[in-house]
Amino acid sequence: MGVENTKQTMSSQNIKPAKDSDDVLHTQFKEVKRSPMRYTMQLLAALAVSMASLMIGYSSSYTSPALVSMRDNTTATFEVTMDMAMWIGSIMPLSALIGGIIGGPCIEYIGRRNTILSTALPFLAGWLFIALATNVAMILVGRSICGFCVGVASLSLPVYLGESIQPEVRGSLGLLPTVFGNSGILMCFTAGMYLAWRNLALLGACIPIIFLILMFLIPETPRWYISKGKIKEARKSLQWLRGKTADISEELDSIQKMHIESERIATEGALIELFRKNHIKPVFISLGLMFFQQFSGINAVIFYTVQIFKDSGSTVDENLSTIIVGLVNFISTFVAAMIIDRLGRKMLLYISSILMCITLFTFGTFFYVKELMDVTAFGWIPLMSLIVYVIGFSFGFGPIPWLMMGEILPVKIRGTAASVATAFNWSCTFVVTKTYEDLVLHIGPYGTFWLFGTLVAVAFIFVIICVPETRGRSLEEIERRFAGPVRRTSAIANLKPMPITI
C-alpha cells in the first residue's frame, strides 16, 4: 500500500506532456532563448506591476515601527490602547481578505492590468487617512483601505505575470513582486528608525504615485484580450511583450486554441467548477501552499518584530535588528529569483521548510531556557534565528505559493480560484496576527514558535506528496498535466488558456 502510494506520488510530480502538442509548444518556447533582449519588455512589465508589491510590503510592515511611536505617551495626541494596537495590526489582513474576494471578478471583467491599476489611488487615500488621523478610527479606516488594496493586488499580480511571461524566465521575473515586497518591508523598517508614524504614513503615500505612472506604460495580458474576443488587441499586446521582431503567430494560435477548448466545455456555476475532477487538485495545492505560508508564522514575526526582540531580552538593539532582518529578507529573495529556474520550485520549498523548521524550534527553545536561567550571554540567538528563518521563508514559502498560483490554476476557473486562494491566504494571515499575542499568553512564546515549527514540518511532507514541479513548462502543459492523459486526436484541442499570487 505504501509503495503503491509512493509510486503514484512520484509519477504525479513529474509533468509528462503528450508528445504531439507539448513537444511543439516546448520547442516553441525554448526558441526564444536566442536573444536575451526578447525579455526586455517582459522585465518592464514585471517591474511596473511589482511596484504594487512594494506597497504591499510597506503596508504589511508599517505597524511594527509605527505602533511604538503611536503608543508613546510623550508624543501621542490621542491614546492607543493595547487592544486598539492589536486591531491596527490585524485590520489590514481582514480587509485584504475582502479585497481578495472582490478582486477575482474584477480581473475577469475589467482585466488584470486595470484591476492592478485601480489600487493606486485608494492606496494613496488610505495612507493620507493614516497620516492625517486625529483619532484611532481614522487610522483603522486608512489601514482598511490599504488592506483592501493589498488583497486585490496580491491576487492580480500572479495572474498578470503568469499570463505575460515566458516559461524560461517565469520563475525569475515571477519572483520580482516578492523582491519588491521585501524592499517595501526594508524601507519601512529603515524609515521607522527615524520617522514617527505620521511621517512614515506620508512616505507610504508617495509610492502609489510612482506606481500609477509605470502602470500606464504596460499592456493588458494577451490571454485576457482573447477571452473577450479582442484578437487584434491580443496580438498587439503579445507582440509588445515578446519584442517587435518576434514571431508570435504560433504562440498566439496556441492561446486561441486553449480558449476555444475551454469555451467548449460545459459551463457550470463558478464555485461548482472548482470541484471538477481536473480542477480540484490544483485548487487544493494552491490552498495548501497558502495555508503553510501563513502558518509558518511569518506575518506574526513581521508585524511584531520589534516586540519579539524586546520580549527576548536580546542585547541587540531591536530597531537595528528589524533592519537587518529586512535586509536579509530582500537579499535572500533576490538570490531565490536568480536560482529558481535552475533548481526548480520544489527544491526551494524543501530548503525553505527545513531552514524554517530548525530556526523556529531554536527560537522556541531560547524562550523556554530564558524562563529557567539568565540568557544574556546568548542574546545573539534571537537575531541569528530570525535571520536564518527569514532566509528560509524568502527562498521558498514566501514567493512560491503566489508564483505557483499563477501557474497551476486552470484557465476555466482561474479568476474564481485565485480569488478563493487569495481570500484564504489573508484569512490565515488575520488568524495568525490576531491570535499571536493570545497564543503567547496561553502557551508562552516558546510554545508558539514550536507550534509554528511543527506546522512547517508538515508543510515539508505536503510538498513531497502533493506539489508538482512546474519549472520550464508552459501554462498549457501544466494544465494538461492536471487534466490527465489525452487522446492523440485531441492533444492540440486540449490546450487551455491561462488567466491568473503572498
From Swiss-Prot:
GO MF assignments: sugar transmembrane transporter activity; trehalose transmembrane transporter activity
Biological process, per Gene Ontology: trehalose transport
Glycosylation sites: 73, 319
Keyword set, alphabetical order: Cell membrane, Glycoprotein, Membrane, Sugar transport, Transmembrane, Transmembrane helix, Transport
Membrane topology, Extracellular segments: 60-83, 142-144, 194-199, 304-319, 368-376, 434-446
GO cellular component terms, A-Z: plasma membrane
Cystine crosslinks: none
Subcellular location(s) per record: Cell membrane
Keyword Membrane applies: yes
Presence of keyword Cytoplasm: no
Record topological domains on the Cytoplasmic side: 1-38, 105-120, 166-172, 221-282, 341-346, 398-410, 468-502
Membrane topology category: Multi-pass membrane protein
Superkingdom: Eukaryota
InterPro entries the record matches: MFS_dom, MFS_ERD6/Tret1-like, MFS_sugar_transport-like, MFS_trans_sf, MFS_Trehalose_Transporter, Sugar/inositol_transpt, Sugar_transporter_CS
Segments passing through the bilayer: 39-59, 84-104, 121-141, 145-165, 173-193, 200-220, 283-303, 320-340, 347-367, 377-397, 411-433, 447-467
Major location category of this protein: membrane
One Pfam match: Sugar_tr
Assigned protein family: Belongs to the major facilitator superfamily. Sugar transporter (TC 2.A.1.1) family. Trehalose transporter subfamily.
Function of the protein: Moderate-capacity facilitative transporter for trehalose. Does not transport maltose, sucrose or lactose. Mediates the bidirectional transfer of trehalose. Responsible for the transport of trehalose synthesized in the fat body and the incorporation of trehalose into other tissues that require a carbon source, thereby regulating trehalose levels in the hemolymph.
PANTHER family: FACILITATED TREHALOSE TRANSPORTER TRET1-1-RELATED, PTHR48021
Name of the protein this chain belongs to: Facilitated trehalose transporter Tret1
Gene: Tret1
